[in-house]
């Protein structure tokens, strides 16, 4: 951990010296994790730009907020922009959220879990009323199972 922090500090120092044009010492520090040499600093030196950027005198983009302070990003025309925003919010919230949650609430029983619980409760009540055990060790009636004869 300490070697890594020392490596980062040494890199920053040598890069700062190279950027400012200070003469860098030919020191090579080696550790188990990092090696810093002047050659790595020279490769990272920024090149001078060959082309200078100039601002376009004729701006193609106009500030839509100057024309319409309530700009929503749907259209350049303020009236169309407001109507598109209202349509998106109506369908996005009213239709999708309200009708979507209603649809999800009234979906049929998934994998019949509710039906299985009701059927189990009905069977328990029937067995308790008739004095039968609630659960039997045999899932199937052994008298109805036909096994092959041993030879």
Swiss-Prot record:
Lineage: Eukaryota, Metazoa, Chordata, Craniata, Vertebrata
Organism in which the protein naturally occurs: Cricetulus griseus (Chinese hamster)
Biological role: Accessory subunit of the mitochondrial membrane respiratory chain NADH dehydrogenase (Complex I), that is believed not to be involved in catalysis. Complex I functions in the transfer of electrons from NADH to the respiratory chain. The immediate electron acceptor for the enzyme is believed to be ubiquinone.
Region of interest (Disordered), residue spans: 39-62
UniProtKB keywords: Electron transport, Membrane, Mitochondrion, Mitochondrion inner membrane, Respiratory chain, Transit peptide, Transmembrane, Transmembrane helix, Transport
Subcellular localization(s) per the UniProt record: Mitochondrion inner membrane
Membrane topology: Single-pass membrane protein
Assembly information from the UniProt record: Complex I is composed of 45 different subunits. Interacts with BCAP31.
Residue stretches spanning the membrane: 87-107
Family: Belongs to the complex I NDUFB11 subunit family.
Protein name: NADH dehydrogenase [ubiquinone] 1 beta subcomplex subunit 11, mitochondrial
Residue range covered by the transit peptide: 1-29
InterPro entries documented for this protein: NADH_UbQ_OxRdtase_ESSS_su
GO cellular component, one term: respiratory chain complex I
Recorded superkingdom: Eukaryota
Keyword Acetylation among record annotations: no
Tagged with keyword Transmembrane helix: yes
